[in-house]
Amino acid sequence: YPAHHITTGEGGMVSSKNEDIIEIARSFVNWGRDCYCVGSANLLPRGTCKKRFSKWIPGLDFAIDHKYIFSNIGYNLKPLDLQGAIGIEQLKKISKIHKKRRINKKKIDKFFEDNIDGIRLVREGEKAETSWFGVPIICDSAETRAKLVSYLEENRIQTRMYFAGNILLHPGYKELDDASKYPNANQVLEKVFFVGCTPTYSDSMISYIEEVILNYKLSCANK
C-alpha cells in the first residue's frame, strides 16, 4: 500500500503567520534551542539577537553561546539536504503521478460500485480535481467493513483505516474531550477504510484487484 504522492523520508511542515508559533516550532525541531537565527543569520558573529555571547542563564555569572541555550524540551527533526534533493526530483513527476492516481481511483471505484453491496464511494466536488491519497470506501456497518477488509487482505490487497477516525476514542487522547461530541468522526472510525491507487500499479495489478472484488461478490452470493 504505497500511499504518499511523493516522499522525502520522515518529516512535515508547520505554517503560521504568528511569529511566536514560528519561533517555538523552530525550537522544537532543533533540540529545543532558544536561538532563532535562520539561514545565513547563523553566520553572524553576534547572531540575530545581537547578543549571542551573554549571560543567558539566571544565576550563572558567565557568558554562554545563545546557540547552546535550550529553552524547550525539543527534538532533532531537521530535514537533510539529501531529502530535499529527492523531493525536487519527484516534483518533476508530480503531474504524471496526479494523472495516474486519478485514473486508478476511477477504475477501482467502478470495481467496487458495480459489485459490492453495502458501501458508498467518495466523490469529488464539481469544480474539484482531487489528487487522491487512496480510494476511500464507506461501509454501511462495522460488520460489512470487517468482512470486506478481511477478504481483501487475505487476497493480498492491502487496506488501511481512515487514519485515527475520532482520535478522542484512542487511549492517548481519551482524556482531552468527550468523543460523543463528534459523531461523524465516530462513523469514520467504525465504517471507513482505504485501498491504494498508487501510480505504480501495473495493468495486471489493476486487473487482479477487479478479479478479487468479483470473487468476493461471488462468495457472498453463494452463502
Task: Annotate the PLM regions.
Residues 17-223:
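PLP-dependent aminotransferase class I/II
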Residues 1-8, 23, 68-69:
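Conserved active-site segment immediately N-terminal to the catalytic lysine
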Residues 9-14:
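Glycine-rich phosphate-binding loop of ATP-grasp-fold ATP-dependent ligases
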